[in-house]
């Protein structure tokens, strides 16, 4: 199985994977220029994610190892999510009574999203998990698993 692991300073002990650490590569924020749709379809003007895009779209499974900050994803992960836009077409379709970007590719990977816990209430955790599930639903992932990091095997904190 072709797997990509996207992490925030949490090492993953896995074989046959492509590992992308958001703490090692500075992901620039989307500047909203629309070049990924109009000038260079499918390619962002910032090129630090080019290799990741290839591995991401060809993977069967993506595993996220994320840190929760103040009850939400980090700014690094949010910038990463925003920069996934080149993987979709600049058109909108109505699917299940909601607007979604049209997929650029015929296949999108399944997602396992594991997070370090930092919630004061169960309701905060529920809102967070629903946000992550909705994000990957919009990213056309068919199988979406969202769980605390303690539920994931073979990870260790990087000092």
Regions found by a protein language model. Give the residues of each.
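Mid-chain, well-packed structural core segment of small domains
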Residues: 89-92, 103
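N-terminal beta1-alpha1-beta2 submodule of the flavodoxin-like/Rossmannoid cofactor-binding fold
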Residues: 1-89, 137, 145-146, 155-157
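Short histidine/acidic/glycine/proline-rich micro-motifs that form metal-
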Residues: 68-70, 117-122
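Short, conserved loop/helix-junction motifs that constitute active-site signature segments
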Residues: 101-109
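Glycine-rich phosphate/pyrophosphate-binding loop and the adjoining helix
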Residues: 120-159
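Alpha-helical scaffolding within the catalytic cores
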Residues: 96-100
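Short hydrophobic beta-strand segments
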Residues: 3-6, 110-119
